[in-house]
């Protein structure tokens, strides 16, 4: 398992090296384009069942989400399934079982990676580490929390590289400042590091050292704020080498993905799908010969009755 300490060591070994151009993704005779489908959730908040009544009656629930995911996987060759945090808290399931059924459900659905939201500490940092260790068969990725000396120290990674159909996809993650938001007793001595600096450091490593064709950041910062508080909007604008930010925390249902320009004037896409598993985000990327990628299609799919 890659730890933040190992990442920093690897980064030090490569520091100062010349930037080399990325090799062409497609060799002669291969297909001219490839497709990657990214499915994503955020702020599900222990909503394992559909809403029983009210505005979202019949919507959400892990059974309906799993059905949609399986249908998309049957139709598409290269699919990633990601979550941007706040898996826990919000229903009696968490009050009674402290995250066990949520982790089991996500593992059964085949999530490729997730990050950590502030409410994932609501049972305490030891509980979070225990539930990940016992029930999650996918990695939790976060680059700006230093868990040294805490139970989470061996249960997270600063990045993950996934190969899909000849594409090399790098994934990192960032979390929100916990001080003032979460009781200190719940997160212990976890240190919060600058998310823009850490995400950029890891993204640079993934693009230059790991030769990733795309870098995705799972973010629990929140999409944007009225003041200058760090957000996904500012992360997109100030970072380098991140292509896509899966947003969370602010529970916003985006009508469509947002497009920003980063510090190098390259495009960064940001998307968020509300909360409670009411929607499943879908982003379809096409990679052309020469490693040119574009967001081809997007859809926020309503989960539940009639979905």
Outline where the language-model segments fall:
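Acidic, metal/ion-coordinating pockets
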Residues: 2-304
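Polyanionic/metal-chelating signatures
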Residues: 307
């Amino acid at each position: 398992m890659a730890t933040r300490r190992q990442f920093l060591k690897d980064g030090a070994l490569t520091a100062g090296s010349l930037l080399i151009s990325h090799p062409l993704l497609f060799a002669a005779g291969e297909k001219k384009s490839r497709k990657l489908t990214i499915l994503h959730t955020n702020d599900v908040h222990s909503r394992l069942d559909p809403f029983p009544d009210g505005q979202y009656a019949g919507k959400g629930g892990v059974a309906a989400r799993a059905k949609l995911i399986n249908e998309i996987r049957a139709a598409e060759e290269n699919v990633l399934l990601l979550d941007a945090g706040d898996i826990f808290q919000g229903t009696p399931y968490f009050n009674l079982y402290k995250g066990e059924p949520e982790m089991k459900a996500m593992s059964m659905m085949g999530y490729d990676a997730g990050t950590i939201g502030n409410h994932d500490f609501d049972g305490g940092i030891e509980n979070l580490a225990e539930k990940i260790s016992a029930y999650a068969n996918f990695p939790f990725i976060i680059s700006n929390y230093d868990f040294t000396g805490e139970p989470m120290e061996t249960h997270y990674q600063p990045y993950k590289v996934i190969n899909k159909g000849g594409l090399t996809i790098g994934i990192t993650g960032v979390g929100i400042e916990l001080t003032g938001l979460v009781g200190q007793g719940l997160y212990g001595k976890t240190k919060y590091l600058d998310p823009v600096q850490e995400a950029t450091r890891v993204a640079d490593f993934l693009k230059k050292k790991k030769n990733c064709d795309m870098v995705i950041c799972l973010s629990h910062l929140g999409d944007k704020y009225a003041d200058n508080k760090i957000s996904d909007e500012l992360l997109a604008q100030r970072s380098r080498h991140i292509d896509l930010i899966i947003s969370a925390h602010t529970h916003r249902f985006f009508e469509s993905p947002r497009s920003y320009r980063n510090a190098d004037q390259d495009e960064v896409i940001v998307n968020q799908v509300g909360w409670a598993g009411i929607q499943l985000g879908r982003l379809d990327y096409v990679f052309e010969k020469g490693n040119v990628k574009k967001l081809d299609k997007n859809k926020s799919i309503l989960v539940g009755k009639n979905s």
